[in-house]
């Protein structure tokens, strides 16, 4: 019986606290991303998005170059 009360108390606390803890910022983000200001969508999030984009592109280009190097190295085996 006591376990049932404890489980109900835990469920009640999990159900009510998460809803009140965070403020809904979806309308703000929608306005930001729907503006027509000639900025690409992947850069509208600010400086963090810009850094993340550049790091991702750098890693993609580096990985592509390394894979081409490995293919070239494997295509000319040593005797």
Curated annotation (Swiss-Prot):
Residues 22-46 are mitochondrial matrix. Its main location: mitochondrion. Pathway: Energy metabolism; oxidative phosphorylation. Keywords: Membrane, Mitochondrion, Mitochondrion inner membrane, Oxidoreductase, Transit peptide, Transmembrane, Transmembrane helix. The chain crosses the membrane at residues 47-75. It is a single-pass membrane protein. GO terms for molecular function: oxidoreductase activity. SUPFAM superfamilies: Mitochondrial cytochrome c oxidase subunit VIIa. The keyword Flavoprotein does not apply. Residues 76-79 are mitochondrial intermembrane. Residues 1-21 form a transit peptide. GO terms for cellular component: mitochondrial inner membrane; respiratory chain complex IV. It holds the Pfam family COX7a. GO terms for biological process: mitochondrial electron transport, cytochrome c to oxygen; mitochondrial respirasome assembly; regulation of oxidative phosphorylation. It is found in: Mitochondrion inner membrane. Belongs to the cytochrome c oxidase VIIa family. Component of the complex IV (CIV, cytochrome c oxidase), a multisubunit enzyme composed of 14 subunits. The complex is composed of a catalytic core of 3 subunits MT-CO1, MT-CO2 and MT-CO3, encoded in the mitochondrial DNA, and 11 supernumerary subunits COX4I1 (or COX4I2), COX5A, COX5B, COX6A2 (or COX6A1), COX6B1 (or COX6B2), COX6C, COX7A1 (or COX7A2), COX7B, COX7C, COX8B and NDUFA4, which are encoded in the nuclear genome. Component of the mitochondrial respiratory complex IV (CIV, also named cytochrome c oxidase complex), the last enzyme in the mitochondrial electron transport chain which drives oxidative phosphorylation. The CIV complex is the component of the respiratory chain that catalyzes the reduction of oxygen to water. Acts as an assembly factor that specifically drives the homodimerization of CIV complexes, mediating the formation of mitochondrial respiratory supercomplexes (respirasomes) containing two CIV: supercomplxes with two molecules of CIV show improved activity. This is Cytochrome c oxidase subunit 7A1, mitochondrial. It comes from Trachypithecus cristatus (Silvered leaf-monkey). The lineage of its organism: Eukaryota, Metazoa, Chordata, Craniata, Vertebrata.
